[in-house]
Amino acid sequence: QVAEPLHISKKTIYTVYPSKEALLLDMVDHAFAEIHHCKQEILAGSGTLQEKLRAVIIAMPTEYAALDLRQMKELDEKYPVVAARVRSQLENGWEPTMALLEQAVAEGVMRPVSLPVLRQMITASIESFLADRSLAESGVQYVAVLEEMISILLEGVLPR
């Protein structure tokens, strides 16, 4: 799946990577590096604190917007080390986001809540979306899922 869009042979890829697992690990690391870069751009950019909160929590570079939600299940089955790396990446690198959340509470943009609980809710939601095939099978795009999640978490479900 990687060789064809790059117009190179599988043999060429395997001269650089000793296995498909090594290739996938590198791809995961690259994807999350891009996500962290995207978050840094959001934090450094203009916009209200509320806009930054919404954007940074669900940051997703354009090239990953079409992410297939069914991939995590396949990784768990075929490449558990890669699946573990994805989970580890989801759980790490939260410092800038946590600082933004703390700022939002301090400035009254967000009511005081347990930030570790909120972080766990976000991480668990993302992991659940990646593991459950039902949303992808019903045609829902991953970015739309993230946008709905953050809307519910930040705005709640009760009418205002």
Regions found by a protein language model. Name each.
Residues 1-22, 26:
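Helix-turn-helix
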Residues 42, 71-75, 129, 133-136:
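Secondary-structure edge/capping motif, primarily at the C-terminal ends of alpha-helices
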Residues 50-51, 85-89, 105-123, 140-148:
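All-alpha amphipathic helical-bundle segments outside canonical DNA-binding/catalytic cores
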Residues 26, 30, 37-66, 118-122:
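Hydrophobic alpha-helical connector segments
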Residues 61-99, 105, 109:
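Short secondary-structure transition hinges
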Residues 24, 28, 32, 83-94, ...:
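Amphipathic, non-transmembrane alpha-helical scaffold segments
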Residues 55, 62, 95, 99-107, ...:
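C-terminal peripheral helix-coil segments that are non-catalytic and often amphipathic
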